[in-house]
Structure formats: C-alpha cells, structure tokens
Amino acid sequence: MSDQYKRTYPISWDQLHRDSKALAWRLLDKDFFKGIIAITRGGMVPAAIIARELDIHLIDTICISSYDWKEKKGEADILKGFDGDGEGWLLIDDLVDTGRTAEVVKNLIPKAHFATVYAKPSGRPLVDTFVTEVSQDTWILFPWDTESQFAAPLIGREQR
C-alpha cells in the first residue's frame, strides 16, 4: 500500500456479495445484456454474482494488469483483449480507482455498459453504474487479498 492511502477499508466476502447483488439490482432496468465481460482479476467474483442475479450465462474476460501485489504499476498492460466494440455487453470490475484501467478498457470496448461495485472520485465519471463510493485516499482490502487475523480496535490504531 503506497503512501497516498491514509485509510484502509476491509471488505468481507459477505459484504462483497451484498454489494455485488445491489449492483445487479441497479442493472435490472437497463437493456438486455448478451453477456458479461469481467475485468480480471478483480471483476471476476462480482461478475459471477451479477451473472447469477441477471441470469446471464455468457461470460468473457479482458485482462488488464495495472497493479502488482503491493501497489499501482506505471502502465496498464493488456494481457487479453476483447473482440468487438462491446455493444450489448456488460463490463464488470470490482473498483474504479484513478480511472487509468477504466480509460484503457473504455477505449477498447467503448459501447459496453461499464459497472463497478466500488468507485473512487477520480474514476467515478468513467463508469455508468456503481454501488458504493469510497474516498480517493482509501485502500480497499478485498477478501481475496486478506487472511483472517486479529485487528486492533479503531481507538487503539489512532493512538499510535
């Protein structure tokens, strides 16, 4: 986690499931989607939940690498693209942060409906639908990036 982040926001599997289902609820009144494009890796779990809720069986991926295990990388690498302009497709990611990945994907698939579970202010204008806004200086701890362990109470953390 780089120095630009002042807070952390841990998300449990249960919360991610609830928030992904809430995103699916918001997408119900949109046009019919012929399939989902999950941005790997973060978009895969939300995409599976949304696919179930919207009864979508066709799922593809686009692979963009913009983070290493610790922090953002300098460039976004396209590891696997998508054929077509995205018309009729639902593009899913876990989070839009600075918008760098979103810009790359929107240029590749400009007609897809872009939805994320979480959005930060810098990237929010690039998505069509999202559920929860998180401050720009917050690092989100997704459940696939964490292990269960003791955490000090908030009051104890502030006194350090």
UniProtKB/Swiss-Prot annotation:
It is found in: Cell inner membrane. One of its GO terms (cellular component) is plasma membrane. Its cofactor is Mg(2+). Pathway: Purine metabolism; GMP biosynthesis via salvage pathway; GMP from guanine: step 1/1; Purine metabolism; XMP biosynthesis via salvage pathway; XMP from xanthine: step 1/1. It catalyses: GMP + diphosphate = guanine + 5-phospho-alpha-D-ribose 1-diphosphate; XMP + diphosphate = xanthine + 5-phospho-alpha-D-ribose 1-diphosphate; IMP + diphosphate = hypoxanthine + 5-phospho-alpha-D-ribose 1-diphosphate. One of its GO terms (biological process) is GMP salvage. PROSITE patterns: PUR_PYR_PR_TRANSFER. Mg(2+) binds at D94. Guanine binds at D97, I140. It is a peripheral membrane protein. It is an enzyme of class 2 (transferase). Its EC number is 2.4.2.-, 2.4.2.22. This is Xanthine-guanine phosphoribosyltransferase. It comes from Desulfotalea psychrophila (strain LSv54 / DSM 12343). The gene is gpt.
